[in-house]
Amino acid sequence: MKEKDLYKRFVNETPKILHHRIENFIGVGFPDDVLYINNKFYTCELKCTDHNKIKISPFQISFAMQHPIGHYFLIGHKKEVKLFESKSIDDLLKEGFKAKNPIANNWKDIRDYLYKL
């Protein structure tokens, strides 16, 4: 799975959310997707991996640590998907996709969680 495919699937799976894809030239470490949900903005970093390890840049780590609320990581691994809060950054770095604290680990639960924000 590639990041662009994960983004397309994310948009298709969450039709009630307005997504704004951010290109890399905006700012180093700024998240890939700005979400507009129930009149509020949130950010989401999209990551894909074929292995357990997740590649997260130092700038993305810094952003996650500075924004512990309202920032998420959507991780695609082969045919699986998980959503994590940014405050889980340490676990993601240590445990990768197998981190034990996702908010949701399938599209239905991701959609249900985000729609309630």
Regions found by a protein language model. Give the residues of each.
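Beta-rich catalytic cores
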Residues: 29
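Charged phosphate-binding loop/patch that engages nucleotide di/tri-phosphates or the phosphate backbone
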Residues: 96-117
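Active-site-adjacent loop/helix micro-motif of nuclease/hydrolase catalytic cores
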Residues: 43, 50-61
